[in-house]
């Protein structure tokens, strides 16, 4: 367990978390702006959850030697990944069992003091419908891939949560 503990407390582990989230955000923006796939409001919320994981990775990269910062990073990682998984599962349900009575809103419901869709419309303004399935890879939809991504984040969290929060041994 000491090798896992050292890895979980290392800058490399947090950098990998950060880079995977950056990769997901880059893919989302590529799909939106290059492939011209319109994101729905649930996609925008998932994008925000990935930004939470990205921020957790950044906190871990900067403060991997400090237990409090590792704790904050792990907490944000867990909350963001769990929220993202919940959203992805809801979107899969909307897409596999579309109902005229269950639709998503046209605008995201951000707090009044933080209207991200107005400040950064090219990133946070939804233009698509939740029931549309604009892209698949290997017969798996984008929302199903996000279930895989957020589940992987949660599994990795469980694997690393205990060693990441242990005190750092100073030599």
Curated annotation (Swiss-Prot):
InterPro entries referenced in this protein's UniProt entry, alphabetically: DiS_bond_form_DsbB/BdbC, Disulphide_bond_form_DsbB, DsbB, DsbB-like_sf
Stretches of the chain found on the membrane's Periplasmic side: 31-48, 90-144
Any Pfam family the entry gives: DsbB
Cystine crosslinks: 40-43, 104-130
HAMAP family, A to Z: DsbB (MF_00286)
Function per UniProt: Required for disulfide bond formation in some periplasmic proteins. Acts by oxidizing the DsbA protein.
Record-given protein name: Disulfide bond formation protein B
């Amino acid at each position: 367990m000491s090798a896992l503990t050292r890895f979980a407390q290392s800058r490399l582990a947090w950098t990998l978390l950060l880079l995977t989230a950056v990769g997901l955000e880059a893919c989302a923006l590529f799909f939106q702006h290059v492939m011209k796939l319109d994101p729905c409001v649930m996609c925008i919320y998932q994008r925000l959850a990935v930004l939470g994981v990205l921020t957790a990775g950044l906190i871990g990269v900067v403060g991997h030697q400090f237990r409090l910062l590792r704790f904050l990073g792990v907490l944000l990682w867990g909350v963001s990944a769990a929220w993202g998984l919940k959203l992805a599962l809801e979107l899969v349900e909307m897409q596999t069992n579309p109902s005229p009575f269950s639709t998503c809103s046209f605008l995201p419901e951000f707090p009044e003091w933080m209207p991200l869709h107005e400040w950064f419309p090219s990133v946070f303004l939804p233009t698509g419908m939740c029931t549309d399935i604009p892209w698949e890879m290997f017969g798996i939809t984008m929302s199903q891939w996000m279930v895989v991504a957020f589940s992987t984040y949660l599994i990795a969290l469980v694997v690393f949560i205990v060693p990441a929060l242990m005190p750092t041994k100073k030599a």
